[in-house]
């Protein structure tokens, strides 16, 4: 599982402890006290870094979900960015997110924590994903392998499209398999991006 990423820093060990607590009981039932106990530190140690559980949760979401995206990014030096590879990369990240234990726990137990990021504002993870997608679009446009267009608008369109496939896939798999829907998403994105 890619979710335990302790790089040796105290902050990461506290986030690891938070992740373990959330995977056990969900966000609403996890407290700073639980996290401190699991991390083997005093509550005030955690409070010095995060004033409340929501701030800590935000940092944990950014760390975990950007790690999913970073692991699946194509190697820009090894392969050109074209419509097909970019579409497949986006589908892979979407699938990886749907299968991420932390993401699944929030969707299953505490989905209300995602509502602000769906209806009201972008989060840091979404901003980072937009920047990443925009960068790939620019590389593909410069080489002529991705259609012309404003990369900022195109990145937002791609992210909006994939949000439905990430958040609502479970509601559409009663008669079809997730792999079939992923193939359709890939086709949509390839046609959207093709020069």
Map each language-model feature to its residues.
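Hydrophobic/aromatic-rich alpha-helical bundle segments in the mid-to-C-terminal region
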Residues: 104-109, 142-188
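Short linear capping/connector segments at secondary-structure termini
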Residues: 74, 107-116
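Amphipathic alpha-helical packing segments from all-alpha helical-bundle domains
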Residues: 69-70, 116-143, 152-156
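N-terminal intrinsically disordered/low-complexity leader segments
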Residues: 1-9, 142
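Helix-turn-helix
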Residues: 13, 21-55, 59
């Amino acid at each position: 599982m890619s979710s335990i990423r302790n790089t040796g820093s105290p902050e990461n060990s506290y986030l690891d402890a938070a992740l373990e607590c959330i995977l056990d009981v969900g966000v609403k039932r996890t407290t700073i006290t639980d996290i401190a106990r699991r991390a083997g530190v005093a509550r005030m140690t955690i409070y010095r870094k995060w004033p409340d559980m929501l701030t800590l949760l935000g940092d944990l979401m950014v760390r975990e979900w950007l790690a999913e995206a970073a692991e699946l990014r194509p190697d820009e030096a090894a392969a050109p960015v074209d419509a097909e590879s970019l579409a497949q990369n986006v589908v892979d990240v979407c699938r990886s997110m749907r299968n991420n234990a932390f993401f699944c726990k929030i969707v299953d137990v505490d989905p209300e924590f995602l509502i602000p990021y769906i209806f009201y504002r972008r989060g840091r993870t979404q901003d980072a994903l937009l920047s990443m997608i925009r960068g790939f679009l620019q590389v593909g446009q410069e080489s002529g392998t991705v259609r012309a267009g404003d990369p900022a608008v195109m990145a937002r369109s791609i992210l909006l499209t994939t949000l439905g496939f990430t958040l609502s896939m479970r509601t559409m798999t009663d008669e079809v398999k997730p792999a079939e829907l992923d193939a359709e998403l890939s086709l949509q994105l390839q046609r959207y991006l093709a020069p």
